Amino acid sequence: MQTDFISYADSQMEYEGYAAFDGAVTTRRPGVLVFHAWAGQDDFARVQAEKLAALGYVGFAVDMYGKGQRGNSAQENNALMQPFMNDRAMLLARAKCALNTLQHHPQVDRHRIGAIGFCFGGLCAMDVARAGLEGVRAAVSFHGLLGAPVGVPGGAKPLHTKILALHGWNDPMAKPADVVAWANELTAAGCDWTLEAFGHRGHAFTNPQAAEAANGMQFCELANRRAYAAMEDFLHETLQEKLSGAPSAKMGACPTPA
């Protein structure tokens, strides 16, 4: 496996992403953005990129905050994240910058892109999907925030990016009413969306460091394993098919209701 830190920039600042891929493969392959949680790009996000590389993708751990900008406490993490919660247009612009970087990677098929994210990163992946960006076929949210952006134009309807939300039903940051609102939003957009909800699970169930059950944040090995299996199947279905357009009937496709 080959791994590289990749510097990229926009008009605001410089960022440092992390790419992982099988260097022995010479053909272009799908790329998957990995959006980090509220602390910034860390070992957890980079490991996810490496796991994706082992599955045959180019994994790219995104840097949403800027090179070297990381949080070391809940207060610092929130200070880094909150500006993006207040300005979802800025969030999408940063995500687009990372997407452009991945799509220009020499190992990547720019027309077969996925996005996954954890917590805050789940929201980032969801906003990329909502925008209907060219080449982005799939988005997966792990215990992500679900609220729709305000004042940010969505993609053309029907939304072409398929979405999978892996959600702890007891997540205090995405309550049942939020889930219903999210489902209604995506249904109205004509999106092919899937929700897999894990009963008795809360926030951060994929993070081995999460151990605050009283606050609704607790790692769960079983839910983690099931969620990753669902992600693998979803990405294989959406990214490994080289032909563009609607999936064929033999793949079990169903028409999206008008």
What is the predicted role of each segment?
Residues M1-A258:
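N-terminal cap/leader regions of alpha/beta-hydrolase-fold enzymes
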